[in-house]
């Protein structure tokens, strides 16, 4: 089974990818993790990616595609199946990915887009608070500390990460709408895309995804 999973930041993509990976024994391919691993290992593509990151530039599509190709070119990896998370983010990336998968005769079984209202995502993410020394995550509504603004374990002041500030979240959502949302239309035209409401409970979202996959792989 080969799945592409995407959706805006804060929609619960990582959680669902982990559930799918464990339930169906699929590899979870996160392009972000791939990049970090390649840079850490000092591979040719990793060094190339680092040169762009160090200049504050986006890593070019051909570098990301190259990393995905390194993975899918291994027959065992193709046979296991995978969930592609965080890629493609633009239509040109989707087209490049199509060419790569056609080269290795890999059909995508399903493209799942998790959706959520912008205000729901802002509420989810802007409510997060972090304990600086341990990285423990709290939420002012869903998982509040016993004492407001203080870590239960260390007593230190909780902080708001830059990524969790409302202005940053809205900017990320705007970028997503402009670049990634058209990717859903691209896959809809191919008849492989399905949308799932990501604001439901984790179990409900997981159940809906399973129903879609069962139908797609009949």
Curated annotation (Swiss-Prot):
GO annotation, cellular component aspect: cytoplasm
Domain of life: Bacteria
Compartmental location: Cytoplasm
Entry binding sites for AMP: 31, 36, 57-59, 86-89, 93, 161, 172
Gene3D superfamilies given in the database record: P-loop containing nucleotide triphosphate hydrolases
GO biological process: AMP salvage
Keyword Cytoplasm (UniProt): yes
Stretches for region LID: 127-164
Pathway assigned to this chain's UniProt record: Purine metabolism; AMP biosynthesis via salvage pathway; AMP from ADP: step 1/1
UniProt KW keywords: ATP-binding, Cytoplasm, Kinase, Nucleotide biosynthesis, Nucleotide-binding, Transferase
Function: Catalyzes the reversible transfer of the terminal phosphate group between ATP and AMP. Plays an important role in cellular energy homeostasis and in adenine nucleotide metabolism.
Entry protein name: Adenylate kinase
Organism: Chloroherpeton thalassium (strain ATCC 35110 / GB-78)
Annotated gene: adk
């Amino acid at each position: 089974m080969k799945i592409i999973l995407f959706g805006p930041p804060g929609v619960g993509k990582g959680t669902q990818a982990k559930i799918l990976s464990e339930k169906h024994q699929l590899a979870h391919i996160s392009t972000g993790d791939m990049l970090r691993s390649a840079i850490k290992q000092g591979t040719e593509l990793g060094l190339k990616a680092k040169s762009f990151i160090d200049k504050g530039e986006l890593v070019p599509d051909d570098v990301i595609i190259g990393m995905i190709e390194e993975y899918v070119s291994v027959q065992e990896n193709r046979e296991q199946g995978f969930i592609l998370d965080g890629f493609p983010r633009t239509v040109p990336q989707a087209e490049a990915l199509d060419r790569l998968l056609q080269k290795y005769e890999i059909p995508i079984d399903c493209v799942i887009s998790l959706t959520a209202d912008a205000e729901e995502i802002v509420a989810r993410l802007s409510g997060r608070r972090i304990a600086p020394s341990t990285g423990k995550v709290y939420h002012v509504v869903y998982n509040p500390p016993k004492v407001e603004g203080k870590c239960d374990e260390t007593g230190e002041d909780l902080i708001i990460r830059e990524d969790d500030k409302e202005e940053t979240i809205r900017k990320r959502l705007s970028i997503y709408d402009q670049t990634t949302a058209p990717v859903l239309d691209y896959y809809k035209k191919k008849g492989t895309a399905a949308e799932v409401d990501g604001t439901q409970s984790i179990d409900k979202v997981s159940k809906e995804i399973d129903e879609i996959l069962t139908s797609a792989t009949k």
